[in-house]
Amino acid sequence: MNPVGINGTLIVQLVTFVILVALLYKYMYGPLRKVMDDRRAKIADGLAAAERGKEEMALAQKRATELLREAKDKAAEIIANAERRGVELREEAQGKAREEADRIIASARAEIDVETNRAREVLRGQVVELVVNGTQRILHREIDDQTHRDIIDRMVGQL
C-alpha cells in the first residue's frame, strides 16, 4: 500500500468521475444551459414586451387625452359659433323688425299728414263758407259797431 493512499481503485474512480463529469457536461450541462439561456432570453423578451406595452399604454393614454381635449375644444368652438350665429340672427331679426316698425311709423305719419291736410282743407272750406255767410249777413243788415262785434264773436265761436 502506498503511504498517500493512492491505489488503482482510486485512479479508476477518478477516471470514471472525470468521464462522468465530461459526459454530464456534454449531454446534460450543455442542453440545460441552452434551456436556461432560452428561458433567460424568453423572460428578457417578456420583460421588454411588458415595458413596450407599458410605453404603448402611456402613449395611447396620452393620445386619448389629446383626442379628448381636441374634442372638447371642437365642441366649445361649435357652441361658440352657434351662440355667435344666434346673436347674429337675433340682431338681424331685430334690425328687420326695427326697419319694419320704422316703415310702418313713416307710413302712418304720412297717412296722418294726408288726413291732417284733408281736415285743414275741409276746415278752410268751412271757414270760407262761414266768412261768406257772415259777410252776407253783415251786408244784409245795417250794422252798427255792437252788431258787428256780436257777429264776429259768434263766427269765432263757430270756428
From Swiss-Prot:
The chain crosses the membrane at residues 4-24. One of its GO terms (molecular function) is proton-transporting ATP synthase activity, rotational mechanism. Keywords: ATP synthesis, Cell inner membrane, Cell membrane, CF(0), Hydrogen ion transport, Ion transport, Membrane, Transmembrane, Transmembrane helix, Transport. It holds the Pfam family ATP-synt_B. CDD domains: ATP-synt_Fo_b (cd06503). It is found in: Cell inner membrane. GO terms for cellular component: plasma membrane; proton-transporting ATP synthase complex. It is a single-pass membrane protein. Belongs to the ATPase B chain family. F-type ATPases have 2 components, F(1) - the catalytic core - and F(0) - the membrane proton channel. F(1) has five subunits: alpha(3), beta(3), gamma(1), delta(1), epsilon(1). F(0) has three main subunits: a(1), b(2) and c(10-14). The alpha and beta chains form an alternating ring which encloses part of the gamma chain. F(1) is attached to F(0) by a central stalk formed by the gamma and epsilon chains, while a peripheral stalk is formed by the delta and b chains. F(1)F(0) ATP synthase produces ATP from ADP in the presence of a proton or sodium gradient. F-type ATPases consist of two structural domains, F(1) containing the extramembraneous catalytic core and F(0) containing the membrane proton channel, linked together by a central stalk and a peripheral stalk. During catalysis, ATP synthesis in the catalytic domain of F(1) is coupled via a rotary mechanism of the central stalk subunits to proton translocation. Component of the F(0) channel, it forms part of the peripheral stalk, linking F(1) to F(0). This is ATP synthase subunit b.
